[in-house]
């Protein structure tokens, strides 16, 4: 009888759904999806802690989770043009609660006054991580490695001017990984910029929006050549989702509904899913 009841308990345990998890996105326009319809995508599916009615990349994450059968409660705290130090100084009251996962996305050049310098970025990341871990010592805190800005690559006056389009993203990735290695409480980084680079290198996406978008390729930047397009944010969201959940994003498939909502074809969605998966696989080797 005891063995029989134990067997039933085991079956029930296996059949029980995974516990819901909470994720918070902290960032700026690269998180809320400025310059693309992503910004207003399904705002009712997420909780905007600033009550601005934003969906953004967090709403794409939630959509992927629903389609994958994963139970995630998704929140965001975003402000345009701000770095992580701003969020720590001004938004602690909103952030200071229990989270399972927190995604930190900083300024596009790490430091507005000293582009490429991760010092201020790293200090603020550590402060936010400490705030999060005071509520949940097991929380996963990840830094987003953002993409190369075409405007800072193909126009003069930037430290990245005239360099290959992959250079800025590579520099940002190296800086974020250094912060993760040396800052207590940071679990790791998410290679969004590397995914953009891979999409360009493999011919899925166009390298230079200033000379037009090559036929058959996707444009990853918005019209300002700075923020993301629908495709660019879609690739960002896929990379974050795959990293956080360890879900093989290729399984979302050509029929993934958010891609269709954003005007991407099934073929384009599948190509971006493959790029995100390949980027994460290479990173995890």
Roles of regions detected by a PLM:
Residues 188, 209-285:
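Conserved catalytic region of serine esterases and O-acyltransferases that act on ester linkages
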Residues 15-18:
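N-terminal signal peptide c-region/cleavage motif recognized by signal peptidases
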């Amino acid at each position: 009888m005891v063995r029989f009841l134990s067997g039933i308990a085991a079956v029930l345990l296996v059949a029980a759904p995974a516990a819901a998890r909470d994720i918070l996105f902290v960032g700026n326009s690269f998180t809320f999806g400025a310059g693309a319809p992503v910004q207003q995508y399904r705002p009712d599916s997420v909780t905007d802690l600033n009550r601005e009615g934003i969906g953004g990349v967090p709403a794409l994450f939630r959509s992927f989770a629903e389609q994958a059968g994963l139970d995630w409660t998704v929140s965001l705290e975003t402000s345009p043009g701000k770095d992580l130090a701003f969020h720590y100084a001004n938004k602690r009251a909103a952030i200071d609660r229990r989270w399972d996962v927190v995604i930190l996305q900083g300024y596009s050049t790490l430091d507005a006054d000293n582009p490429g310098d991760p010092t201020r970025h790293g200090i603020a990341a550590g402060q936010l991580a400490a705030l999060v871990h005071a509520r949940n010592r097991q929380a996963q805190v990840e830094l987003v490695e953002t993409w190369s800005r075409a405007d800072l690559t193909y126009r003069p006056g930037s430290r990245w001017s005239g360099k290959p389009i992959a250079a800025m993203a590579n520099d940002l990735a190296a800086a974020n990984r250094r912060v993760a290695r040396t800052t207590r409480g940071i679990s790791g980084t998410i290679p969004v910029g590397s995914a953009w680079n891979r999409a360009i290198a493999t011919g899925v996406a166009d390298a230079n929006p200033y000379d037009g978008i090559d036929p058959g390729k996707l444009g990853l930047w918005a019209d300002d050549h700075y923020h993301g397009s629908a495709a660019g944010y879609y690739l960002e969201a896929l990379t974050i989702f795959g990293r956080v959940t360890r879900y093989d994003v290729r399984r979302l498939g050509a029929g993934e509904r958010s891609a269709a909502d954003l005007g991407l074809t099934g073929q384009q969605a599948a190509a971006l899913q493959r790029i995100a998966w390949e980027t994460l696989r290479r990173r995890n080797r």
